[in-house]
Amino acid sequence: EDADSKSKHKPANVIDVDKDGSTDDDWRRANVDSVICNLYKAIQEVKPWVRFGMGIPGNWTMKSKAAAAYGISLPSGISAMESYDYLYCNAVEWAKQGWVDYLNPQIYWSTQVTRQNYRVLCQWWSQTVCENFSNKLPNGQRVQFCVSQAAYGATDADAGLSGYGDGVVEIQRQIDANRDNLSSGYTGSVFFNTSSYILLFKDLKESHFQHKALIPPMDWKSKTQLSAPTHITLIDTLLSWQHPSAERFTIYAYPRGMTFETAKNDPQYLKGVVYGYNIRLDGYGDLSQQTIAVCSYDRYGVEHAAAFYEGNEVFIPKQVIFWELNGGTIDVELPTY
């Protein structure tokens, strides 16, 4: 059946898989690669801000020959279903070529088992795949890495997943393992499935997700510089502003005297993402003693210029735009308001 399919659909300019020494499995992977590559390119042409990624089984392969072709090692002691061989999904190639915005390996095994250990696989994806490939793409592009975790293993005893007897504690151990790999590429968690995650939500909110967070930015795609919001007003707890083009904004409230950069790096000061031009800041303490920042926030998850409110005073820092011109730069300083 494969031979008939190859004979019917293989383009004339493609070398015969038998003659070049590759196998039917290589041919299948090449076809999957083609779908991923062409779909990614099509999305970039129409809506480049749409995030395109793939959820694949948490174990890439156990074949040393496949790893050697990419100059990488395999995770030690792992024995599990392989996406490379069973599904013909070569996620390492997608990361190397930058054909996806994110990879979502489904590591549905626990930290308590040996042959499919969560920590080992999480570290391999973030350090081996991200550091060797997705963090070395041209023009600042990165393939972001977020693990899919088996929330259902912690809530459904009938799921039969080994090592999940501790319930939410196992999920917390996994999140800790993820965060151990922040420097090499980890950007977040995906939980399967929603109904199970809802049962864990209260515990996780109290332990690991106490504050709001922004999605990882795709700053290499963002091309337009958004100006700061204007006409900020605060009436009681209703904060309002105006902007000619931006449609969503990030809001911060932090102690006066603290720098904005410091506040941005501490999630307790992020008060929300707003689609629109106002927000209620109820429950955030005495606003008269805080600096409130409103940041233009684009579709790529990139924060742009901010405006600041302190009491009745609104101020917008000087903004500098750089134009590249014949190898040099021209600095244009916009006025403050």
Predicted regions and their residues:
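Extracellular fibronectin type III
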Residues: 297-331
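Short beta-strand segments within Ig-like beta-sandwich modules, predominantly Fibronectin type-III
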Residues: 269-276
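Extracellular low-complexity, O-glycosylation-prone stalks/linkers
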Residues: 246-268
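Polysaccharide-binding and catalytic clefts of secreted carbohydrate-active enzymes
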Residues: 1-99, 108-109
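Conserved aromatic anchor
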Residues: 236-246, 332-334
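Proline-enriched interdomain boundary motifs that mark the N-terminal boundary
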Residues: 223-232
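Beta-strand-rich modules
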Residues: 255, 281-304
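Substrate-binding cleft of secreted/luminal carbohydrate-active enzymes
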Residues: 88-115, 125-221
